[in-house]
Amino acid sequence: MTVVETTPQAGLSPQQLAMLFQYTVEAYKVFEKLAENLPNPMTRAMFAQFAVDEREDRDLIEMKAAAVGARGVRVTLGSDMIFSDILEGEMSYRESAEFLISRERTLQRKLREMIGIAPNADRNFLVYLEAVKRAHIVELERDLELIRIDQDWWKREDAEWRIVHGSPAV
């Protein structure tokens, strides 16, 4: 008879929750600003929904922290300088979309890794957060393709018309 020693799996650490919270707060700020500032109504709506998603994720992270007894999730508000570049128009729309896709993918990968070793009590939480990231990636990739067709896609106030009729001939 073989005996396998098992140790109870610990849940999410305060550091992991803090990392998720930090990412969520930063992403919320960027998505909210993009939703406020971009003239393209379709892209504006996409980023507004992303901001709602990040607020919901933040609330879930706070609830999870409370459930596991973590004492408040601290966050430093020094976000990436690249976010400033995006919001100030220092990056092209293509570069901005590529950066946002990369950032969402990075967190999605971290969440996938966490799901693989998480105890059952944390899996639903992590799967939910990972699916939100996956959905954001799909929509950002769609916008990136539209930017490749029209480099000023995020500026287009006539976005719906262009989707239906195509870009006018120059």
List the predicted regions and their residue ranges.
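Iron-associated oxidoreductase/ferritin-like identity signal
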Residues: M1-V170
